[in-house]
Structures are given as structure tokens and as C-alpha cells.
């Protein structure tokens, strides 16, 4: 969509102050769109002020709305008048305690129902685009493999759905809760496309591990995980190991490519709907460690354990078939993640041999 076509077009970004949401808000404002961004607390000046300062001179095209996942009706004012709605990922640690819901998954599914209804009632929404997670697209087989007990499909693709009935090494009850919320919310959203007369299209993008850079003042957890072999952070390195066991590889994508893909799906004409995996590279932890060891030979890089994992690649690139192109490969994602972490103080730039700033 040309910039002149974006003039007057209103889009809603839920979770606008988050890692992906803030980058997306900036990109949309730069392209000339009017953005309705939701925050859990518009009185939090650190977050609200950051969004207002993202693009100089664009403040008049940014409206901030207070909305809470556990009170889905609060999203209605932000959605009203918008032609496109971006449902950005739920915060990993969101706590349902004190709400009417038994779990985050229950709250998310209820919010999906409410938001879809609000989009219908708006009579303006043309497309809803959701940042899903590749963690809900595991190629693990339900049948046990005699040698290891764990097996994978030959490829990962959009037909893969994570089964919580399959055990795998390093499985975590905490991570299971996250998977369940992402799994159920994505399936609920996609089911809308199969209704009798849907009022708009739904697109979901199951994202790989999102890293690279941030406009926030701290390194996001996924960036911390991407640089874990360099920082030697065992907890963040543990997330890489869990993902590799779950997925048979470590899908990576740069946050800028994620937001380009989201905008691509919004601007796609005349129609786009359904599920599209979004990852630029599918390395193993061994590949990531090897890159860092080559880049920083003077450092003691945290290495992978000896457990064997099959390397599962994508069967196809459905986004690419539509015309989307990734700008960042594995090396660029990892290198920019290190630079980001060093800039924000999560890594010691002097030890890396980098200039901080």
C-alpha cells in the first residue's frame, strides 16, 4: 500500500507497549497510518511516553487506549473505526490471579471471542492479524520412537499443531501453560474463517524466536535467550533447549521482519487468510553456538549438551509464496541481538570487543 493510501486508514495494535507491539506501532506510524494502541495502563508514562516519542511529528496519528485482557470489553473503543486489528502476543508471564478466570488460556480464549465480536460490531474491520507462536506448531509425533522415545515429522509446516499429550525431554509445566494459551487462541481465531459468513479475514503468524533489536529500554526475554550462549545465562539457554526439543530446530526471526510480515499481511490485496509460519532460519543450538564461537573466539561460549535432536526444516515458505522476503538471516539476527544486548547493558560490550552505544 502506497503511503498516500495509508492516509486516513486506522489500525489497532493490542499490546502496543510490548516488544513486538512497540516496533509495529513505530513502523505503522512511519508508513502514515493512524494507530490505536492499547496498553494495560495508559497512566504508565514510561510506556505511554515511549510510544508518543517513537516517530517525531506523528503524535497526532497515535491514540492510546487502556485495555486489559481480563476485561475484554475494554478493547472495543480501540477497535472502533479501525480497518485492521493486530492482536499481538500475550505477555509470557501474565497472571490470571485475582481475575474471574482459572488460567491465562481461559482468559485469552474468552478475550478472542469478545474481540472477534467487537470487530464484527465495528462494521469497519476488514482483517484481523494475530502474532501466534511456533511453540504451538510442534512437529513432534504422538507415536513413540523406539530408540529415543521422541520422533518428529520430516518437516514443520502450517498443518503442525502441538500435542500436549506428548512427552519430550526438558518439558516444563510452566511452558505448557504458555503453549496451551497460544494453541487455543490461535485455533479459535482461525475457526472464524470457517464460519457461515465471516465479516472479515483472520490471519495468524506463528512466530519463531523473535530477536534482533528493540525500541524498549531493556532487552526482551527472547533477545536475552538468543544471546544466552554468550551471556552464559543458564535460564535463558534453557529456553533454547526446550524449544529445540519441542520443534526439532530453533526457528529464528528478526523483530523487524516480523513487523514487515504483519504489515505485508495487512496490505495484501485482495485477500489473505489462514496460517503462515514466520521464521527466517531454522538452525540448531549447535549452529548458533558455532556462530558465536567463531565471532567471539576469546570468550567461553556456553555450549549445547549432548542430547541428540533431529533437524526439522520447513516444508515450504507460504509467506514467501505470497511475495514476502526476509531481510535478516541467522547470522544477522544473532549479531544484531548481541549488539542490542550490549547497548542495553545485558552484555559487557568491552569484553565482546564492541563499542557500546
Swiss-Prot record:
One GO term of the biological process aspect: toxin catabolic process
Entry protein name: NADPH HC-toxin reductase 1
Alphabetical list of Pfam families matching this protein: Epimerase
Entry EC number(s): 1.3.1.-
UniProt miscellaneous comment: Plants susceptible (e.g. cv. Pr, cv. K41, cv. K44 and cv. K61) to the fungus Cochliobolus carbonum race 1 contain a transposon insertion (Drone) in Hm1 and a deletion in Hm2 due to a loss of resistance. However, the compatible cultivar Missouri 21A (cv. MO21A) possesses other defects in Hm1 and Hm2 alleles coming from different mutational events.
Function: In tandem with Hm2, NADPH-dependent Helminthosporium carbonum (HC) toxin reductase (HCTR), which inactivates HC toxin, a cyclic tetrapeptide produced by the fungus Cochliobolus carbonum to permit infection and acting as an inhibitor of host histone deacetylases (HDACs), thus conferring resistance against C.carbonum race 1 in resistant cultivars (e.g. cv. B73 and cv. Wisconsin 22). Catalyzes the production of 8-hydroxy derivative of HC-toxin via the reduction of the 8-keto group of 2-amino-9,10-epoxy-8-oxo-decanoic acid, an amino acid of the HC-toxin.
Coiled coil start-end: none
SUPFAM superfamilies in the cross-refs: NAD(P)-binding Rossmann-fold domains
Activity regulation summary: Activity is sensitive to heat, dependent on NADPH, and inhibited by p-hydroxymercuribenzoate and disulfiram.
